Amino acid sequence: MELKDYIATIENYPKEGVVFRDISPLMADGNAYNYAATEIVQYARDKEIDMVVGPEARGFIIGCPVAFALGVGFAPVRKPGKLPREVIEATYEKEYGTDTLTMHSDSIKPGQRVLIVDDLLATGGTIAATIELVEKMGGVVVGCAFLIELDELKGREKIGNYDYKVLMHY
């Protein structure tokens, strides 16, 4: 299946000069959505995953069906003020300024094998902060999976030596 057929390209969104890759058409097609999730599940099967972690909001959309198929739990990564219990934080650099991500402080147990799933790998800031959060709790990141990588933004450099899978490159 050619997954790029299910990605809408929107010029100058959310601001001038940006090309937005919209996964909504992929999610709206049951066969394409299932195919994408299954590709990530197949990547993860031999990694002995204990937990899937996904950053809001589209990491939830991809990560939850993957966790379900693997028979493991899902832990959300959110912006500050969105989780009701004690959290840990990781701050990362963006193009203009910084941003912070949080997780419940008991989301990951020491030694748990974690797969991080998100829709898009762009600059790598979100994935780097998510890796930091997992490792602060003693988790072991055994892989990262993305629907899309924007190659020119070089986000893979922030992943370093972590194993990862990308379904589509732009």
UniProtKB/Swiss-Prot annotation:
Compartmental location: Cytoplasm
Q: What is any one of the record's Gene Ontology cellular component terms?
A: cytoplasm
This protein's UniProt keywords: Cytoplasm, Glycosyltransferase, Purine salvage, Transferase
Q: What pathway does this protein act in? A: Purine metabolism; AMP biosynthesis via salvage pathway; AMP from adenine: step 1/1
Spell out the molecular function terms from Gene Ontology: adenine binding; adenine phosphoribosyltransferase activity; AMP binding
Q: A GO biological process this protein is involved in?
A: purine ribonucleoside salvage
This enzyme catalyses:
AMP + diphosphate = 5-phospho-alpha-D-ribose 1-diphosphate + adenine
Q: Which InterPro entries match?
A: Ade_phspho_trans, PRibTrfase_dom, PRTase-like, UPRTase/APRTase
What CDD domains does the database record attribute to this sequence?
A: PRTases_typeI
Report the EC code(s) recorded for this entry.
2.4.2.7
Q: Which Pfam families match?
A: Pribosyltran
Summary of the function given for this chain in its UniProt record: Catalyzes a salvage reaction resulting in the formation of AMP, that is energically less costly than de novo synthesis.
Q: Which PANTHER family has this protein been placed in?
A: ADENINE PHOSPHORIBOSYLTRANSFERASE
* Entries under NCBIfam families matching the protein: apt (TIGR01090), PRK02304.1-2 (NF002633), PRK02304.1-3 (NF002634), PRK02304.1-5 (NF002636)
Q: How is this protein organized at the quaternary level?
A: Homodimer.
What protein family does this chain belong to?
Belongs to the purine/pyrimidine phosphoribosyltransferase family.
Q: How is this protein named in the record?
A: Adenine phosphoribosyltransferase
